[in-house]
């Protein structure tokens, strides 16, 4: 995702901030997971109806009126109901507000399938920072600990979006060349970081399942314990490279046990 110009340059963080005011909303529990009272779980795509553009519990996550939105919808694919994303020089996502304590639900599991890589995509360069798939987790925290630059970004986000910027986010991405476990930082703020979990073409066109300990990933990336999880999101973007891409997302869930 790349945004040009002084106003457009904060669109990613503005998009993340969009859900800052939604943190207190609790989604119904996901089938098959026992969730403590007062906590939410991720609504599964597999229980949505084919043709639905907005699965129950999920919200559109548009970055800017100047940027085309990626199209999402529930489809039947290989005998399963999954979320399909189609990006055409576009960038947007879907998100679900949550209220989860990482120490109680430390593990996130998801599935995705990518038909092809995005030519020219390079999330390290800041020029072609697109990814066919992203799973994004946002966290609350003590914003008084943010440095001057991050406070300035937060104020700008508040000005442009009317929403508070989350304390921190992790984006799990598929990269063209960088090896798995590579950590990348957002160009404008240290409070949004990417973690490469898949790279290169070797496992294209197949369903891949990932399970991550968000506590461990957060500790490694931010050097402190993770605060409450306030939303989970998915995003497929191709606007930086001016290309088209598609991808499939299976159910996402948080769980207690490894």
Where would I find each of the regions flagged by the language model?
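C-terminal motif of bacterial Sec signal peptides marking the signal peptidase cleavage site
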Residues: 18-21
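Extracellular carbohydrate-recognition regions
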Residues: 23-64, 148-155
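Extracellular beta-strand ligand-recognition surfaces/modules
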Residues: 26-30, 133-135, 190-200, 204-242
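Extracellular beta-strand elements of beta-rich domains used
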Residues: 45, 232, 252-254
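Short carbohydrate-recognition loop motifs
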Residues: 70-92
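Extracellular/lumenal carbohydrate-interaction signature centered on repeated Trp-anchored short motifs
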Residues: 97-108, 201-204
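Extracellular-facing segments of soluble proteins and assemblies that are Gly/Ser/Thr-biased and enriched
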Residues: 104-154, 158
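Extracellular/luminal beta-rich ligand-recognition
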Residues: 130, 140-188
